[in-house]
């Protein structure tokens, strides 16, 4: 049985959403399920009651999360919900031309989610817009191995723990 993942998209220009669409297609081809939610008007409630999440976000300005992700980020920051039932991964988009803020949108989400008890599966995928590679192609190649090597084992361990506590 495949893994079910919610892909949350923070974007300014639509690139992260395009990446998410390619990622979802790769997941579905490999027998997994997923949904895409653009972060517009989302709050921390999106993470309840838990589950598997993939944050796909660009970086904007001086290392900020995109405008459409601000409400969600602020909700996490002020509400401080317990996210111990959340397993997540990250696709961070940036440009090394801005080396001091490269992929900071993703890094900020990573730090916040970890502070709130969420468990990150594997390492963050960082795409450099100056690299000459297309972010959607890189992410589509990355996501299925990420699920199978990192996310699925964490989900199985969490499911076992939950059933033992029931």
Where are these regions (language model features)?
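FMN-binding flavodoxin-like domain, especially the glycine-rich phosphate-binding loop
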Residues: 2-4, 14-18, 26-30, 49-166
